[in-house]
A protein has these predicted regions:
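Conserved GNAT acetyl-CoA-binding A-motif
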Residues: 104-116
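Conserved acetyl-CoA-binding loop-helix of GNAT-fold acetyltransferases
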Residues: 83, 89-102, 125, 129
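Acetyl-CoA-dependent GNAT
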Residues: 3-74, 79, 97-98, 103, ...
């Protein structure tokens, strides 16, 4: 595998869309495929940075970083971290997370939050190694 290069996606191109269609089902089998218009909305939004990890020309990982201001400060949240099954264990997830943490800090966030299912043992181990701490909180979701 070539050296991993991580960069924000700045153009909603066909290769990024194809990568989303290939990678997102590896994260969530219940998610609907993203459309080119939806990808364009993500890329154009000031509140979202979509990072792509490439090995050569192939996109082998994605991470979405949401950054937003609320009355108590700038918040950052990592979502939809996925590394292709063929590239796991090769530093792709770490490279994506480090890029997101750097961008969040550059934009003024003091903390970055994420959630991860307990069954994702390797991912949880990575987050802890990177310095994430498990919070004593409840996470709630309201389905609309």
């Amino acid at each position: 595998m070539s050296a991993i290069q991580v960069a924000p996606v700045t153009l909603a191109s066909d290769d990024v869309l194809v990568a989303c269609h290939r990678l997102i089902p590896q994260l969530s089998s219940s998610s609907n495929p993203i459309t080119l218009d939806e990808l364009q909305d993500i890329v154009k939004s000031d509140a979202t940075v979509l990072f792509a990890a490439r090995s050569g020309q192939e996109i082998v990982g994605l991470l979405a970083l949401a950054i937003f201001r609320i009355p108590t400060g700038v918040r950052a949240w990592i979502e939809d971290v996925v590394v292709d099954e063929s590239a796991r264990g090769k530093g792709v997830g770490e490279a994506l997370n480090r890029a997101a943490l750097s961008e969040a800090g550059r934009r003024g966030a003091k903390t970055v939050d994420l959630t991860s299912r307990p069954s994702r043992v390797a991912a949880n181990r990575l987050y802890q190694r990177l310095g994430f701490k498990q919070r004593d909180t409840n996470v709630y979701r309201y389905d609309l």
